[in-house]
Amino acid sequence: MKNINPTQTSAWQALQKHYDEMKDVTIAELFANDSDRFAKFSATFDDLMLVDFSKNRITEETLAKLQDLAKETDLAGAIKSMFSGEKINRTEDRAVLHVALRNRSNTPIIVDGKDVMPEVNAVLEKMKTFSQAIISGQWKGYTGKAITDVVNIGIGGSDLGPFMVTEALRPYKNHLTMHFVSNVDGTHIAEVLKKVNPETTLFLVASKTFTTQETMTNAHSARDWFLKTAGDEKHVAKHFAALSTNAKAVGEFGIDTANMFEFWDWVGGRYSLWSAIGLSIILSVGFDNFVELLSGAHAMDKHFSTTPAEKNLPILLALIGIWYNNFFGAETEAILPYDQYMHRFAAYFQQGNMESNGKYVDRNGNAVDYQTGPIIWGEPGTNGQHAFYQLIHQGTKMVPCDFIAPAITHNPLSDHHQKLLSNFFAQTEALAFGKSREVVEQEYRDQGKDPAQLEHVVPFKVFEGNRPTNSILLREITPFSLGALIALYEHKIFTQGAILNIFTFDQWGVELGKQLANRILPELGDDKAISSHDSSTNGLINRYKAWRA
């Protein structure tokens, strides 16, 4: 990957001038001037997904200039570098190959002179065999009963991805009940343990090193709880499995290393649901559906790596995001799925985007003088409409939004889905076109009211519009289409990081707090007053000690 400051390119300078021409142009004007706008600014993927980006403050000239930026920063070279196994995570000297985990073509992918695909396929086969034994009831707990509940213990990528996918694919789930524990707050594990039976529960401990503080604290608490009933430590092997690479620590915990599922340094945590970390997904929806999830992602990988940039969906969405973040000053993006099963999707890509591109140092080690990753947030529709859409419609901040919905619901209950989708379509129309003062006044006349007598209310009912959105309409949310959608967002994030000259696949920002917590933890072991920190931290610790005494 080349290290090119995007602001030093001629394309960036051209975009700055273009912004000066575009900043006062409205979406309404763009539609009024082009009856073919939807056709020009939308695209489909495999007849499974329609991406409509026409309700954005862009023209064909805007996209051409953004594509020039991608060319000048050598995005094409960056894509080739990732897919070929080059160590593009330079701060950790690692390749970035989550695409290998879903490489259904089995084309060799080489890291350090070695094809990784045989190992990937071997772990998949091992997961298949294990999951089939659990799901079928062939695997028995220590009292001879089949497993009924699975508790995934992890944090970050070892939790957010599997939790999001198992929720999104709940219509495909089997008889096993899934639980997810992540927070080191004892309340999280305590509440889950109240719901399960030690005789019929399987714990998955997801930690590559088997040293992650939160995960191992929860795992040891789960083990202690289990042994209070089971008694004999040899029974741990029937109720615990590990998603890890530390065989020694796994064995010492009491887990049979035959039930340890490995993954590799070239798998980043927030891109790991495709790996052994996805075992909870397999146990929830079955191996065949997991393969469909992989296949959908692989199809998007092929689209991303082979489709010209002008028609490449992840690239188009990434470029539009850069346009708003760096030229319009938009600091956030909202992800708004109109599907209740997708209620964790925004939270998942909150980590995916903010941990990847929340960087202020470029690939040369210099502080940047431009915007990098946006703040990501969102909730399912229509809940959000009754919570934060007010600010999106009439606030002072630009919030570009992605609206996501399936055309076909898994629950065709009465006219629920038509009502849901009517809101999905209405919101992007309202955000784009708004409501003028003239329309508000005419509405009052139509009601037999005199607008002049309601002058004190009229301004508050005006919507400026011109709020940008993308609409992603899926035929249906299936394992395949979900895999493709997740990969679409992954590659959007990669594209933005590549163009913005930052390292997308490390996360040093999580380290400092961990280090300080490890220093503070021993200080909490007694009731002595602390004076080793700043006055604020000292004051907080000392009040905590006084109150707990």
UniProtKB/Swiss-Prot annotation:
Keywords: Cytoplasm, Gluconeogenesis, Glycolysis, Isomerase. Catalyzes the reversible isomerization of glucose-6-phosphate to fructose-6-phosphate. The gene is pgi. Belongs to the GPI family. Pathway: Carbohydrate biosynthesis; gluconeogenesis; Carbohydrate degradation; glycolysis; D-glyceraldehyde 3-phosphate and glycerone phosphate from D-glucose: step 2/4. Its EC number is 5.3.1.9. SUPFAM superfamilies: SIS domain. Pfam families: PGI. PANTHER family: GLUCOSE-6-PHOSPHATE ISOMERASE. This is Glucose-6-phosphate isomerase. One of its GO terms (molecular function) is carbohydrate derivative binding. One of its GO terms (cellular component) is cytosol. It catalyses: alpha-D-glucose 6-phosphate = beta-D-fructose 6-phosphate. Its main location: cytoplasm. GO terms for biological process: gluconeogenesis; glucose 6-phosphate metabolic process; glycolytic process. It is found in: Cytoplasm. The active site is at residues 355, 386, 514.
